């Protein structure tokens, strides 16, 4: 499940790519598939270890690195493309992280940043205190204009905006209503199965879910994506 549109990111074979906050590695693997030389970076050592195992089994050039986004261990201009997906909403020092992302992006390079979209995320916070008080969880909600201003303040030129995951916003509203940790609720289980069918591109079902996702995403897509260039 990709949040970033790699066509808009403009990744070319041989590009040096940083996936900051890689988590399970979904964007890192796609960047490798497209021929990028990828560094998957995360503060979670266990996630980095798991991602490294998958990378070793894949064709391509990839490495997984454990570290702190506030102090990236890379030289200035080290990367042609940078992805930071669903990361900034977790970090108190978000402006420091953005400055680091700008620093390691070469002139002419492109950054894709994704965060939870303001409207759907605001609904989650309103429906459940548990959703946003969990340790390591979301500590802020971004308006698109505020995030764009932070990127501009770091010297980047915002060139585009997108949204993703229209089917996922209602899923999280449901989870907030029945209890964020209540994975066994029958409605949650049924909805999750539908999302899995969509991700797995099951015949017939995925055609319906993708049509629904395309219709819903402009209005309630769970994620906001901004694309910015280093001048």
Model-derived segments and their meaning:
Residues 1-75, 81-85, 95-98, 139, ...:
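Conserved N-terminal segment of class I S-adenosyl-L-methionine
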Residues 95-110:
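A short glycine-rich, Lys/Arg-flanked "PGG" loop and its adjoining helix->strand segment in the class I
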Residues 160-197, 222-223:
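Conserved catalytic loop of SAM-dependent methyltransferase domains
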Residues 113-140, 148-149:
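Short, glycine-/aromatic-enriched active-site segment of Class I SAM-dependent methyltransferases
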Residues 38, 111-112:
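A short hydrophobic/small-residue beta-strand
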Residues 85-88, 114:
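Residues lining the SAM
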Residues 139-154, 161:
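Short alpha-helix
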